[in-house]
């Protein structure tokens, strides 16, 4: 996300990056050849799908649990725990035919009762889940037999199939339990390809392959997540064999991962991420309640300098809530022009004028705020510095506060104890953004933590869910894109490229529209490689 750059600052940035380059010619020391170790900036918080609101928790719980549906490599919805389904002509009923002989990690059998239990849990108002609205349009869920379940909707619901991609919970293990209790969020039992072996808080999470997985035992024996809170240390761990996979920063990808050594031992990938980075405002704060102020801030930010100076070209400017890869993206919405003069004019119209110290003031109060950034995210921290300088030129003081990710998420964002934040959204392929932007989703733990409210957007978000007509949905979401371009509920900064890197001993890896992890259970390390490393 973020700001501006003078040519001098660009030089300083690149000079500091160059000094940080570390040569490496020694082969990575692989201690567990048939395990994959993944680097993560943050620890998971809760390994239950209903409660997994952060990316670390969601990614790991995705290996432990299955939904009824999932995406294939071409982003087509296919069956997961559901073998097939029938949809009524009016779209108001779905009958799911569930797979047989599916076992939970403790050996119990998966049945339709688990699906009903999951539904009843997610709609329970006492459960602090951000996903309840995905099941709000449901009238009832009925168990027809052990492996058949019927879902009836009150009205058409376009993301219905996708919504059932949420992980199903084990009734026999969680019924009558408080699923928010630390024991249950840290000791999950799923049906997925991997089961939890060990969780050392702040250090690592270890998953073992599930021998009785219904699609066949994964070929990689163990999946390990190591918590490494900064990308520089993580990159060193990658080069010396401490981890096998990480998402590179743009400087790492461009300046450090192009050596013969690196190309010999690692696969590099590059593709547009399906999400964006933004500067978010607490819209309950009176400083940000006037859209002219938000427009003015956006006009003061030079996104191209961020793309060049922070992302090194590995990204594109963001114009709204849908990335260019989305069918909901509106190509007619142009990016807001970087123009400090327009910014100053808008601030004057909103009542903010320069005082004696050269700072913007209103009613004797200077325009000053603090932006929160998560520790270890190099791109966001550098973006914050650029934003600070951009806004300084028009008379705004922006302070930067760096926080550990889980503390930032649960102590500040969930509780709305912030003025502004630099964050990112990784989006679903269906453009239903109800959970992020609808005014009903502002409670603690939900995703509209900036407290955005717009009656037209609320109506459009509901309409987008209620029609199966593709062209109608497209027009609805493109209209939302237009509204956001005017309202600037946040400053949409950039769409970063995903820059993952993986050790070359893993075979069967296929880059696809959905990324590289779609077929992970079939990745393997050839036997001769395992023997060689051992």
Provide a role label for each language-model segment.
Residues 39-89, 120, 127, 189:
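N-terminal lobe/hinge region of extracytoplasmic solute-binding protein
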Residues 42-58, 81-82, 108, 130, ...:
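A structural "hinge/loop" feature
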Residues 83-128, 150, 234-237, 287:
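Aromatic- and charge-enriched surface segment that lines or borders ligand/interaction sites
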């Amino acid at each position: 996300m973020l700001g501006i750059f003078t040519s001098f600052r660009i030089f300083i940035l690149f000079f500091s990056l160059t000094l940080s380059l570390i040569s490496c010619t020694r082969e990575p020391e692989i201690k567990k050849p048939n395990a994959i170790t993944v680097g993560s900036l943050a620890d998971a918080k809760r390994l239950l799908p209903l409660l997994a609101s952060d990316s670390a928790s969601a990614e790991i719980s995705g290996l432990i649990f299955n939904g009824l549906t999932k995406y294939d490599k071409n982003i087509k919805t296919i069956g997961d725990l559901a073998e097939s389904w029938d949809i009524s002509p009016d779209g108001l009923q779905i009958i799911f035919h569930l797979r047989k002989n599916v076992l939970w990690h403790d050996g119990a059998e998966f049945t339709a009762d688990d699906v009903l239990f999951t539904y009843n849990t997610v709609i329970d108002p006492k459960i602090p889940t951000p996903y309840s609205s995905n099941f709000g349009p449901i009238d009832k869920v009925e168990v027809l037999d052990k492996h058949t379940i019927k879902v009836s909707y009150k009205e058409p619901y376009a993301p219905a199939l996708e919504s059932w991609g949420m992980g199903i919970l084990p009734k026999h293990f969680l019924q009558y339990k408080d699923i928010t209790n630390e024991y249950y969020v840290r000791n999950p039992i799923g049906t997925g390809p991997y089961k939890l072996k060990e969780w050392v808080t702040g250090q690592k999470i270890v998953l073992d392959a599930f021998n009785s997985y219904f699609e066949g035992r994964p070929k990689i024996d163990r999946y390990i997540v190591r918590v490494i809170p900064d990308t520089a240390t993580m990159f060193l761990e990658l080069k010396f064999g401490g981890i096998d996979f990480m998402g590179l920063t743009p400087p790492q990808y461009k300046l450090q991962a192009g050596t013969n050594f690196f190309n010999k031992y690692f696969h590099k990938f590059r593709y547009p991420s399906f999400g964006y980075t933004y500067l978010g405002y607490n819209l309950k704060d009176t400083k940000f309640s006037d859209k002219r102020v938000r427009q003015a801030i956006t006009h003061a930010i030079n996104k191209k300098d961020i793309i060049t100076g922070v992302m090194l070209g590995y990204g594109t400017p963001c114009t709204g809530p849908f990335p260019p890869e989305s069918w909901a993206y509106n190509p007619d919405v142009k990016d807001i022009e970087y123009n400090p003069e327009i910014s100053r004019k808008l601030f004057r119209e909103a009542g903010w004028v320069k005082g004696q110290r050269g700072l913007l003031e209103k009613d004797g109060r200077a325009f000053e705020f603090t932006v929160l950034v998560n520790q270890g995210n190099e791109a966001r921290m550098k973006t914050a510095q650029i934003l600070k300088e951009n806004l300084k030129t028009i008379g705004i003081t922006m302070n930067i506060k760096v926080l550990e990710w889980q503390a930032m998420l649960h102590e500040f964002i969930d509780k709305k104890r912030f003025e502004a934040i630099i964050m990112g959204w990784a989006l679903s392929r269906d453009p239903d953004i109800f959970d992020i932007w609808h005014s009903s989703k502002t409670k603690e733990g939900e995703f509209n933590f900036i407290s955005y409210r717009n009656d037209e957007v609320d109506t459009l978000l509901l309409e987008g869910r209620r029609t199966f007509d593709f062209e109608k949905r497209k027009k609805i979401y493109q209209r939302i894109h237009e509204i956001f371009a005017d309202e600037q509920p946040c400053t949409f900064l950039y769409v970063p490229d995903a820059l993952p890197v993986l050790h070359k001993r893993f075979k069967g890896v296929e880059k696809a529209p959905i990324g590289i992890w779609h077929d992970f259970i079939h990745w393997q390390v050839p036997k001769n490689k395992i023997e060689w490393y051992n």
